Design a protein with these regions (language model features):
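Short beta-strand element of the alpha/beta-hydrolase
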Residues: 78-87
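Short beta-strand/loop motif that positions the catalytic acidic residue
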Residues: 221, 227-229
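Catalytic nucleophile-loop/oxyanion-hole region of alpha/beta-hydrolase
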Residues: 93-96, 101-102, 116-151, 269-275
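Primarily recognizes the serine-hydrolase "nucleophile elbow" in alpha/beta-hydrolase
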Residues: 134-220
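Conserved alpha/beta-hydrolase "acid-adjacent" motif
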Residues: 234-241
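N-terminal cap/lid segment of alpha/beta-hydrolase-fold proteins
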Residues: 20-77
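C-terminal catalytic histidine-bearing segment of alpha/beta-hydrolase fold enzymes
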Residues: 241-293
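Active-site glycine-rich loops that stabilize anionic/oxyanionic intermediates
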Residues: 86-91, 231
Length: 293
């Protein structure tokens, strides 16, 4: 936990919105993403909310998906990488709170991180998760196709998502066998199946009755998953619970943590709630799977 606290100290002591600088930023698509025919205009970064400390950077109007690359020091790299999908209800991306801060923490444990700026807003589309999941699947293929360049193991690439980003990451993972767009180039010849997924308070996987939506059918080929959710989250923890139970039925080794308090949108910023310990539990899970060696 000491490493995480050192990484987060600056964010907890200043009230300005800052985001770590990536080593590089790469385009996810060579041209317009699938299904896009119009220009959404310039991206918009919203000012922090009044009294918000530490501040959160919120980005919207994203029509050109990118990957921001964060690489750990060479002497600490273990070959594992993770693609991070920030949350924001498919309307904004909580860019630093659920993106760049998370990337820096992963770097501190030797994991390369890629923050996905996926298309949004898509909340009014049906299904709202499709475009973000397309971007996530393409991102997996892109990182895997350039594994040598980034010094990562092509068999140790994960997807991580928060809230709506958790749905994007989860949908991309569950539907790995059916690429959610037509392949267009050599990158798309590379597998889009992540080797693991981390879903933190994932949203929208269950219907009004609390049942898992049928389009998210899990089988034995689904990658292992780690879940962290709070019992008192207004975005029901049943999404995590139902997905975990289906993984259990399919024999896919996974891990579920439901904390009594924590609410929604806690990212990995420290608090008095037990939910803020999820990064350590995630680190232990990754280590147990041999992904931090």
């Amino acid at each position: 936990m000491q490493r995480m606290n050192l990484v987060l100290l600056l964010w907890m002591t200043v009230g300005v919105a800052v985001a770590a600088e990536p080593a590089k930023i790469i385009d996810v698509w060579p041209g317009k993403p699938p299904g896009e025919t119009t220009d959404v205009g310039p991206e918009v970064t919203h000012p922090p909310k009044d009294g918000e400390t530490p501040a959160t950077i919120r980005i919207t109007n994203i029509g050109k998906p990118t990957l921001s690359v964060f690489l750990p020091p060479k002497e600490n790299r273990n070959g594992t990488s993770v693609i991070i999908c920030p949350g924001g209800g498919f309307n904004i991306l909580a860019w630093n709170k659920e993106g760049t801060e998370v990337a820096e923490w992963f770097n501190s444990i030797g994991v390369a991180a890629f923050v996905l700026k996926y298309r949004c807003p898509t909340g009014s589309r049906s299904p709202n998760w499709l475009a973000p999941a397309q971007d996530a699947q393409r991102a997996v293929s892109l990182v895997r196709s350039r594994a040598t360049e980034f010094n990562v193991d092509p068999s140790r690439i994960g997807l991580l998502g928060f809230s709506a980003g958790g749905m994007a990451a989860g949908a991309a993972t569950i539907k790995h066998a059916q690429r959610q767009y037509d392949a267009s180039d050599d990158i798309d010849k590379t597998s889009c199946r992540p080797d693991f997924a981390v879903l933190v308070y994932p949203a929208y996987f269950v219907d009004k009755q609390g049942d898992l939506k049928p389009e998210f059918a899990i089988d034995k080929t689904t990658p292992p998953m780690f879940f962290a959710h709070a019992f008192n989250d207004g975005v029901t923890c049943e999404s995590s619970v139902r997905l975990f139970l289906e993984l259990k039925k399919a024999g896919v080794p996974s891990e579920l943590h439901v904390y009594s308090t924590g609410g929604h949108g806690f990212g990995l910023r420290p608090s008095s709630d037990a939910a803020s310990t999820w990064p350590k539990r995630c680190e232990e899970w990754l280590a147990s799977r041999g992904l931090l060696k």
